[in-house]
Amino acid sequence: MCIRDRDAGAYRSLAEARVRKPAVDWTRVPVPRKTGRYLFCNYPLEELVPLVNWSYFFSAWGLPGRYPALFDDPKRGEEARRVFDDAQRLLSEIVDRRLLRADGVIGLYPAASDGDDIVLYADESRERERMRLPQLRNQQADRERNLSLADFVAPLGSGVKDYVGAFAVTAGLGLEELAGRYRSEGDDYRAIMAKLLADRLTEAFAEALHRYARVTLWGYEREGQWSVGDLLAEKYQGIRPAFGYPSAPDHSLKADVFALMDVGTVTGMTMTESYMIVPGEAACGLMLGHPEARNFSVGRIDSEQLASYAARRGTDSEKMRVLIPQHLIDM
């Protein structure tokens, strides 16, 4: 049966979408060298600079284009070069004077999937559940496979021991004071640029810690195996979807990861009642190591999946509507 959205086409029922999940080869599950939680406080900013994605920086500045080819654009190239030079000077000042601080925490835990849920276990015995992280599933009828992040974690009863990672990072500690000082001096330009640089450093930090997880914790990747360009293009094995990303649109799952790794205690990050991380230049999500794991978009879901997901999250459909309003089918 297909459901039709007035604006966005046809959707499969939840039952049909679940039948169309991908067939994953569970003989390829990576076995980690280490598990547990790892803290990275006051991380060296100079190590993050090479991982900054300047294309995204320019897009946020209103100058879309691929770096460094953007400099040759006949319309935007000159301005892009000027902004880049200014950003380099400010970035050097931030790094040299430690005007921002980067705190992060990652963890790797025994895990399994149970339907559309990811289950994390308390220890390697896998006898006691530590946490359940329900996931959403794509229902679009024009997709050959309807994906959920849970599809890339070995299922209960498979006999395969799998693992799931989590992360929470920020490179925005100190930004409020820094941007406030610039604004008090009448320098809104530098205040805006400092925020965008903190955003980019945060993403670079997430990339750096994901690389650490792949190389040191899972151990399926060698140090230096990928160039910076390859890392920014995400050519490596595994994914790190942050909550709020298209494959994990429910921001409330951040609270679960904060509780899992005690993020608010061991880092400078806090969380509001509306699941916004403070400072705002932060990212929080999951790390999946299976070579077939890939990013995708959940898109819109029907009322049946909304009710199922809400129940698995321990709430009701109306409250969940508030959390993911853009992902509901308009019947």
Where are these regions (language model features)?
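Active-site loops and adjacent core secondary-structure elements that bind or stabilize anionic groups
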Residues: 1-192, 196, 217
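C-terminal accessory domains/tails appended to large, multi-domain proteins
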Residues: 146-331
